[in-house]
């Protein structure tokens, strides 16, 4: 019986050395230690032994069983450690590898132009002012000297929400709001979104403007021309030709359209400038005394100028964009160029 137990232990240890999985280990445990296992079968034979042999062999059985259980437990621990090590190896992260590059967006050309224009005027001492896009008739028209029968007040040109509330058609209302809150001197620019009933290759029902205002004692038309010339030369390059043509705006007098030498043909004449050599980019003029009356400024003491430009038009000229609608279509093939 003793020899049989020793042989059984040797066989179990030999098989155990070949086991590499937890399932295999469980099969071996059942084979030798289960209810119908080989060691259990030996233990059932103890009853056939003499009273003298029974305690001796019983001691051997317990020793074999304890040793086998210990070896199985040790093998199980090693298998679990091997599994854990393999998992760690397979899931190892090489921190020296470069990270995956994510596609990076770019700023929209409209944003780029607004930022550049804002920076130029900041260098000239202008602050940025803002106002609501849903505006009252008083700020959008009345305080800016638009007569009641002015075409801009018609439904085909303006998005009216009610008889006196509308989507602002320009950012000039910001100038009125600023002057009502602030005594001179005033030096601001007002970038923002504006709305008009218009849509084609060169017009959009929603577009962007930057308007500027400077009010102080002794401000002249010469100051206006000087400021705009500096701005144009910084935006389009030194030496860019500038000319002012007489025009009319309800809120300025005198008024002027400001042209630059065509950025495409350098003033020689082409299809873009209709062979004139010039491109209109903004309107400007000296603030009308009637506007001062609405904001309680004394026009005998203070004078000033205002100007306004469409950002889309500036962007089209600066980047050579032929169709304004490209600026609003969110086509990444177009936007990635900036």
Swiss-Prot record:
Subcellular location: Cytoplasm
CDD domains to which the protein is assigned, alphabetical: PheRS_alpha_core
Alphabetical list of Pfam families matching this protein: Phe_tRNA-synt_N, tRNA-synt_2d
Keyword annotations from UniProtKB, A to Z: Aminoacyl-tRNA synthetase, ATP-binding, Cytoplasm, Ligase, Magnesium, Metal-binding, Nucleotide-binding, Protein biosynthesis
Molecular-function annotations in GO: ATP binding; magnesium ion binding; phenylalanine-tRNA ligase activity; tRNA binding
InterPro entries tied to this protein: aa-tRNA-synth_II, aa-tRNA-synth_II/BPL/LPL, Phe-tRNA-synth_IIc_asu, Phe-tRNA_ligase_II_N, Phe_tRNA_ligase_alpha1_bac, Phenylalanyl-tRNA_Synthase, tRNA-bd_arm
Cofactor binding, note field: Binds 2 magnesium ions per tetramer.
The protein's required cofactors: Mg(2+)
Primary localization: cytoplasm
UniProt catalytic activity: tRNA(Phe) + L-phenylalanine + ATP = L-phenylalanyl-tRNA(Phe) + AMP + diphosphate + H(+)
GO CC terms in record: cytoplasm
Binding-site residues, Mg(2+): 253
Recorded family membership: Belongs to the class-II aminoacyl-tRNA synthetase family. Phe-tRNA synthetase alpha subunit type 1 subfamily.
Matching PANTHER family: PHENYLALANINE--TRNA LIGASE, MITOCHONDRIAL, PHENYLALANYL-TRNA SYNTHETASE
Protein's name according to its UniProt entry: Phenylalanine--tRNA ligase alpha subunit
Native species: Geotalea uraniireducens (strain Rf4) (Geobacter uraniireducens)
Gene transcribed to yield this protein: pheS
């Amino acid at each position: 019986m003793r020899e049989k137990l020793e042989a059984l232990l040797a066989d179990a240890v030999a098989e155990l050395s070949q086991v590499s999985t937890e399932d295999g280990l469980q099969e071996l445990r059942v084979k030798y230690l289960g209810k119908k296992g080989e060691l259990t079968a030996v233990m059932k034979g103890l009853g056939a032994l003499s009273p003298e042999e029974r305690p001796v062999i019983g001691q051997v059985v317990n020793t074999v069983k304890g040793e086998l259980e210990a070896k199985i437990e040790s093998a199980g621990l090693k298998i679990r450690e091997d599994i854990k090590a393999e998992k760690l190896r397979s899931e190892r992260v090489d921190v020296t590898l470069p990270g995956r590059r994510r596609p990076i967006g770019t700023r929209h050309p409209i944003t780029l132009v607004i930022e550049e224009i804002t920076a130029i005027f900041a260098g000239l001492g202008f602050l940025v002012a803002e106002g609501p896009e849903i505006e009252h008739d008083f700020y959008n028209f009345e305080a800016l000297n638009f007569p009641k029968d002015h075409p801009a007040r018609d439904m085909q040109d303006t998005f009216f929400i009610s008889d006196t509330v509308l989507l602002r058609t320009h950012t000039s209302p910001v100038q009125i709001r600023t002057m009502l809150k602030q005594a001179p001197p005033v030096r601001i620019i007002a970038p923002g979104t504006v709305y008009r009933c218009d849509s084609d290759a060169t017009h959009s029902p929603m577009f962007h403007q930057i308007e500027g205002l400077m009010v102080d004692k002794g401000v002249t038309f010469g100051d206006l021309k000087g400021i705009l010339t500096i701005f144009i030369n910084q935006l389009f390059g030194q030496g860019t030709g500038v000319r002012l043509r007489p025009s009319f705006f309800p809120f300025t007098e005198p008024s002027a359209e400001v042209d630059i030498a065509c950025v495409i043909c350098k003033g020689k004449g082409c299809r873009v400038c209709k062979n004139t050599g010039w491109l209109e980019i903004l309107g400007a003029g000296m603030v009308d005394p009637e506007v001062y009356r609405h904001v309680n400024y004394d026009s005998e003491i203070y004078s000033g100028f205002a100007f306004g430009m469409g950002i889309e038009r500036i962007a089209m000229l600066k980047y050579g964009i032929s169709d304004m609608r490209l600026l609003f279509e969110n086509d990444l093939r177009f936007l990635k160029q900036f």
